[in-house]
Design a protein with these regions (language model features):
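Sec-dependent N-terminal signal peptides
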Residues: 4-13
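Compositionally biased, intrinsically disordered or flexible polar/acidic segments
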Residues: 18-152
Protein backbone atom coordinates (compact mmCIF):
# COMPACT_ATOMS: atom_id res chain seq x y z
CA UNK A 1 0.00 0.00 0.00
CA UNK A 2 2.86 2.41 0.70
CA UNK A 3 4.08 2.05 -2.90
CA UNK A 4 0.81 3.42 -4.25
CA UNK A 5 0.80 6.41 -1.92
CA UNK A 6 4.31 7.57 -2.82
CA UNK A 7 3.72 7.70 -6.57
CA UNK A 8 0.99 10.40 -6.47
CA UNK A 9 2.89 12.41 -3.86
CA UNK A 10 6.07 12.37 -5.95
CA UNK A 11 4.09 13.52 -8.99
CA UNK A 12 2.66 16.47 -7.06
CA UNK A 13 6.12 17.55 -5.96
CA UNK A 14 7.45 17.55 -9.50
CA UNK A 15 4.58 19.59 -10.92
CA UNK A 16 5.01 22.44 -8.43
CA UNK A 17 7.95 24.18 -10.08
CA UNK A 18 7.54 27.93 -10.61
CA UNK A 19 8.28 29.67 -13.90
CA UNK A 20 11.64 31.42 -14.18
CA UNK A 21 12.30 35.01 -15.18
CA UNK A 22 11.12 38.22 -13.58
CA UNK A 23 9.04 41.06 -14.96
CA UNK A 24 7.78 44.09 -13.02
CA UNK A 25 4.66 46.01 -14.04
CA UNK A 26 4.26 49.55 -12.68
CA UNK A 27 0.53 50.15 -12.50
CA UNK A 28 0.71 53.95 -12.94
CA UNK A 29 2.21 53.39 -16.40
CA UNK A 30 0.23 50.30 -17.40
CA UNK A 31 -1.96 50.31 -20.52
CA UNK A 32 -5.33 48.68 -21.03
CA UNK A 33 -4.84 44.96 -21.84
CA UNK A 34 -4.43 44.13 -25.52
CA UNK A 35 -3.09 41.16 -27.48
CA UNK A 36 -0.28 43.40 -28.77
CA UNK A 37 1.08 44.37 -25.33
CA UNK A 38 0.16 41.11 -23.60
CA UNK A 39 -0.48 42.86 -20.28
CA UNK A 40 -2.51 45.64 -18.71
CA UNK A 41 -5.74 46.59 -16.98
CA UNK A 42 -8.48 44.18 -17.96
CA UNK A 43 -12.24 43.46 -17.71
CA UNK A 44 -13.18 46.90 -16.31
CA UNK A 45 -11.91 50.40 -17.03
CA UNK A 46 -8.52 51.29 -15.49
CA UNK A 47 -8.97 53.03 -12.14
CA UNK A 48 -8.95 56.83 -12.08
CA UNK A 49 -6.51 58.60 -9.76
CA UNK A 50 -7.50 58.24 -6.08
CA UNK A 51 -10.20 55.75 -7.12
CA UNK A 52 -11.84 53.36 -4.67
CA UNK A 53 -13.03 51.05 -7.44
CA UNK A 54 -11.83 47.47 -7.85
CA UNK A 55 -9.69 46.67 -10.88
CA UNK A 56 -8.20 43.71 -12.75
CA UNK A 57 -4.70 43.31 -14.19
CA UNK A 58 -3.84 40.55 -16.67
CA UNK A 59 -0.62 39.21 -18.18
CA UNK A 60 -0.50 36.73 -21.07
CA UNK A 61 1.64 33.79 -19.90
CA UNK A 62 2.00 30.09 -20.71
CA UNK A 63 0.53 27.48 -18.37
CA UNK A 64 2.46 26.94 -15.17
CA UNK A 65 3.07 28.12 -11.64
CA UNK A 66 4.01 31.75 -11.09
CA UNK A 67 5.54 33.45 -8.08
CA UNK A 68 3.74 36.79 -7.90
CA UNK A 69 4.84 39.70 -5.71
CA UNK A 70 2.53 42.68 -5.31
CA UNK A 71 3.61 45.98 -3.77
CA UNK A 72 0.49 47.27 -2.06
CA UNK A 73 0.13 50.94 -1.14
CA UNK A 74 0.04 54.42 -2.61
CA UNK A 75 1.90 57.70 -2.22
CA UNK A 76 -1.42 59.56 -2.48
CA UNK A 77 -3.89 57.70 -0.26
CA UNK A 78 -4.35 55.07 2.43
CA UNK A 79 -5.91 51.80 1.35
CA UNK A 80 -7.33 48.44 2.27
CA UNK A 81 -6.60 45.86 -0.42
CA UNK A 82 -7.72 42.30 -1.12
CA UNK A 83 -6.07 40.34 -3.94
CA UNK A 84 -7.54 37.37 -5.79
CA UNK A 85 -6.21 35.52 -8.83
CA UNK A 86 -7.79 33.62 -11.70
CA UNK A 87 -11.25 32.42 -10.61
CA UNK A 88 -11.41 34.54 -7.48
CA UNK A 89 -8.87 32.47 -5.52
CA UNK A 90 -8.11 34.54 -2.42
CA UNK A 91 -4.41 35.23 -1.77
CA UNK A 92 -4.35 38.45 0.27
CA UNK A 93 -7.25 39.62 2.43
CA UNK A 94 -7.89 43.18 3.63
CA UNK A 95 -4.33 44.46 4.01
CA UNK A 96 -4.37 48.06 5.32
CA UNK A 97 -1.72 50.55 4.18
CA UNK A 98 -1.23 54.15 5.26
CA UNK A 99 -0.54 56.97 2.82
CA UNK A 100 3.07 56.53 1.54
CA UNK A 101 3.32 53.07 3.17
CA UNK A 102 4.12 50.03 1.01
CA UNK A 103 3.82 46.34 1.85
CA UNK A 104 5.07 43.53 -0.39
CA UNK A 105 3.32 40.17 -0.41
CA UNK A 106 4.29 37.11 -2.45
CA UNK A 107 2.22 34.08 -3.45
CA UNK A 108 2.19 31.28 -6.04
CA UNK A 109 -0.54 31.18 -8.70
CA UNK A 110 -1.22 28.21 -10.97
CA UNK A 111 -2.43 29.26 -14.43
CA UNK A 112 -4.06 26.81 -16.86
CA UNK A 113 -6.05 26.85 -20.06
CA UNK A 114 -8.10 24.12 -21.77
CA UNK A 115 -5.31 22.93 -24.09
CA UNK A 116 -3.51 19.85 -22.73
CA UNK A 117 -1.20 18.62 -25.50
CA UNK A 118 -1.46 18.15 -29.25
CA UNK A 119 -5.15 17.70 -29.99
CA UNK A 120 -6.19 17.06 -26.39
CA UNK A 121 -8.35 19.60 -24.58
CA UNK A 122 -10.16 19.80 -21.27
CA UNK A 123 -13.90 19.76 -21.90
CA UNK A 124 -15.55 22.55 -19.95
CA UNK A 125 -19.18 23.35 -19.39
CA UNK A 126 -20.74 26.47 -20.96
CA UNK A 127 -20.85 28.22 -17.57
CA UNK A 128 -17.07 27.69 -17.19
CA UNK A 129 -16.19 29.47 -20.45
CA UNK A 130 -16.51 32.88 -18.74
CA UNK A 131 -14.25 31.85 -15.84
CA UNK A 132 -10.87 33.54 -15.62
CA UNK A 133 -8.96 30.28 -15.15
CA UNK A 134 -9.52 28.90 -18.67
CA UNK A 135 -7.87 31.59 -20.78
CA UNK A 136 -4.29 32.45 -21.80
CA UNK A 137 -3.90 35.17 -19.16
CA UNK A 138 -2.96 35.27 -15.50
CA UNK A 139 -5.52 37.69 -14.06
CA UNK A 140 -5.28 39.41 -10.69
CA UNK A 141 -8.25 41.14 -9.06
CA UNK A 142 -7.61 44.05 -6.67
CA UNK A 143 -10.57 44.74 -4.44
CA UNK A 144 -11.35 46.06 -0.97
CA UNK A 145 -12.71 49.32 0.39
CA UNK A 146 -9.80 51.26 -1.19
CA UNK A 147 -7.66 48.93 -3.34
CA UNK A 148 -4.15 50.32 -3.88
CA UNK A 149 -1.22 48.64 -5.64
CA UNK A 150 1.95 50.27 -6.94
CA UNK A 151 3.45 47.34 -8.84
CA UNK A 152 3.25 43.65 -9.65
Amino acid sequence: MKKYLWIPLLGLGLSATAQTGTKTYLLDEAPRYSEETGYGYDLVAPPAKDSKSPFFFSVRVPDGNYKVTVRLGSRKQAGITTVRAESRRLFIESVPTKKKEFIERTFIVNKRNTHIDGNEYVRIKPREKRKLNWDDKLTLEFNGSVPVCESI
